[in-house]
Amino acid sequence: MFEFHADDYGLFPEQSRRILDCIENGVINGVSIMPNSPYLKECMEFLSGKDVKLTVHLNLVEGAPLTAGACEHISGDGAFNISFGKLLIVSYIPFLRKKYYEEIKRELEEQIKAVAPYFKDGYRLDSHVHYHMLPVVFDALADVIRENGIKVTYIRVPSEDLKLYKGIKLRPINRVKVMVLNTLARRNRRKYKELFDKFENKKFSGVACSGEMNYENVKTLISRIDASENFEILFHPGAVLEDEDIARLTSKDDMAFLTSENRHTEEMATKMLKDNKDVEI
């Protein structure tokens, strides 16, 4: 069973309408919602009556923290400003780790509380740029879940088998990202085995082909997956095109990524998959 998933829903209204279009006219049947977005409530109204799986897109990258004023290490000038690499290093330096851990824990707790009205039967969790895989972040998240008795049914584990992409041209940086995330996934699964045993188990695709999730590549990928497997395939079809919204983006990486022509390519891939009856989904 495939979950065709779109991240970043709720970031901006028009951007979210583009994802909505991929639900109505494409194969998207799951979205991750941005818990710290000031536009989330408005964007959630667009989904009224839609049969779509919701996931919390825990966010330590884009926009302002919900714990503004209490997170000096992970934000500055009113917005998040902590890189993946820095948090990876911090994860293994004890005297720094504690400071970041406490701030991250408070922020994750507030983000989960902020979206409580949309999750009546338990939470599904992932994160922007997969930050939740970082040791200090995952440890904080696990403690938030445990200490608050939060019912969680799924946490995305962005672990991929590169053999699945044989013959598909992958960007070298994506290969590196996959190796890093696979290593972090093994660490988290090993440390929190009892926690993961309670979750829905899904295989994942979306980092190796990031920037290359075009129709032909996705069609090839689907043909290699056993239809009986529980599989999440990740897209980012939510382009940010409005000048006023582009100006509101706080992450330079997000600005480049969300304004890229690749967002339209992925949008079209979701629609072509729905239209092509030769592709078994």
Where are these regions (language model features)?
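Active-site histidine-anchored catalytic micro-motif
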Residues: 127-129
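Terminal accessory/targeting
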Residues: 1-3, 13-124, 136-281
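DG-centered beta-turn motif at the end of beta-strands
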Residues: 6-10
